[in-house]
């Protein structure tokens, strides 16, 4: 399993903003979970893909988004301001 933080350099969609926008977990099976912080749209969400390449194709914004590997959750720069009730 690998942990990444999605850093958006340019927001072409105008939805998630720039800077740290999501936490990404890539499981050994290839399944990938993307958990968006929800800063600009105020709609935090989690999306699961059966392949990492699908998540990258949809959210990579043609190279305008980087994935920075994190060794532990404590290294994430972004902050989640909400918790489910």
Q: Which positions does each model-derived feature cover?
A:
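Short intrinsically disordered terminal tails
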Residues: 1, 74-85
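A short, compositionally biased
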Residues: 1-3, 27-30
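A short beta-strand micro-motif
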Residues: 1-13
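A broad, low-specificity signal marking well-ordered, structured residues that form hydrophobic/aromatic
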Residues: 4, 20, 32
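A structural detector for beta-sheet-dominated domains
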Residues: 7, 68-70, 83
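A generic structural motif
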Residues: 7-9, 25, 35-37
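Amphipathic, interaction-prone secondary-structure segments
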Residues: 14-27
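Acidic, aromatic-enriched beta-alpha/helix-loop junctions
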Residues: 28-72
